[in-house]
A protein has these predicted regions:
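Thiamine diphosphate
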Residues: 1-167, 171, 174-327
Length: 327
């Protein structure tokens, strides 16, 4: 089984789906001849041509609007938002149009589209190239919100998203594009949208994470294992719809829960996980649910020392696990 990094898995998923279904096309800034700023679409322009790999103006509202219109006419657009920080001009199109079209038409119209959005900090991008805006969209019924944490899941989830009859926002942890590697089958497969994945079984503390933070959570779990702390790591993978069953099963086993994400603490996705636990497994808890998240400041600093202060890392996760384990 070949090994590849996360961005290679994303590219392979799009390539395979474009070869499988001629309705699939890509639209976004620099996705054509340049192959994308992260090289996620490299080679696809030469293979499929300018009518299926379309360079757009710097206008996210138009990128998503074109995708919605094409989807309504039976196409399967994959819209790339160059950085998730740039998704806000398209917010109305996503929330008011794409997410609500099936509901308002009583199921007559569907919007089978994917919006790919590299997210997260840690690459020296500063305020406007480091944001994690996933919580805005998990508050929007009608959307599915997916965050892969491994090359295997990146390929399988993206293929599932492209085949889905409804709009999917596909957040990709850009710091992990080339850092996270793993085996990926060459044959056609999908990873179903919805179920979380227990990637490390344990009995003392449950850690819930996604994207780059899941990668770090596994490292932190190995670090504290040497101290006798047995950590269960749950990769949430799909943020909306929420896999509440897997979350509750894990907490009922360990009695302690840590939720990790790099987005700001207040109003972040971790609050939804914490509420799920409070409502469904309160009597199973041996300690308060702990959230380890980015601080409530307007953006990720450009200064590298300040960026390191902002970002969650394996050492910070390990420290939070130790604190919970002492209860």
């Amino acid at each position: 089984m070949p090994e590849m990094n996360l961005v290679e898995a994303v590219r392979q998923a799009m390539d395979e789906e474009m070869g499988r279904d001629e309705r699939v096309f890509i639209v976004g800034e620099d996705v054509g001849k340049r192959g994308g700023v992260f090289r996620a679409t490299v080679g696809l322009y030469d293979k499929y041509g300018s009518e299926r790999v379309i360079d757009s103006p710097l206008a996210e509202l138009s990128i998503v609007g074109v995708g919605i219109g094409a989807a309504l006419y039976g196409m399967r657009p994959v819209c790339e938002i160059q950085f998730s920080d740039f998704i806000y001009p398209a917010f109305n199109q996503i929330v008011s149009e794409a997410a609500k079209m099936c509901y308002r038409s009583n199921g007559e119209w569907t919007v089978p589209m994917v919006i790919r959005a590299p997210y997260g900090g840690g690459i020296g991008g500063g305020l406007y190239h480091s944001q994690s805006p996933e919580a805005y969209f998990t508050h929007t019924p009608g959307l599915k919100v997916v965050v892969p944490s491994s090359p295997y899941d990146a390929k399988g989830l993206l293929k599932a998203a492209i085949r889905d009859p409804n709009p999917v926002i596909f957040f990709e942890p850009k710091k992990g594009y080339r850092l996270i590697r793993g085996e990926v089958p060459e044959d056609d497969y999908i990873v179903p949208i919805g179920p979380a994945n227990v990637t490390r079984s344990g009995t003392d503390v449950s850690v819930f994470a996604y994207g780059m933070m899941h990668f770090y959570a596994l490292q932190a779990a190995e670090k504290v294992a040497a101290e006798g702390i047995d950590v269960e790591v749950v990769d949430l993978r799909t943020l909306y719809p929420v896999d509440r069953q897997t979350i509750l099963q894990s907490v009922r086993k360990t009695g302690k829960a840590l939720v990790v994400h790099e987005a700001n603490l207040t109003g972040g996705y971790g609050a939804e996980v914490a509420a799920t636990i409070a409502e469904g497994a309160f009597t199973d808890l041996d300690a308060p649910v702990r959230r380890l998240c980015g601080p409530d400041v307007p953006g990720v600093p450009f200064s590298h020392p300040l960026q390191d202060w902002f970002m969650i890392n394996p050492d910070k996760i390990a420290a939070a696990i130790r604190e919970l384990a002492r209860w």
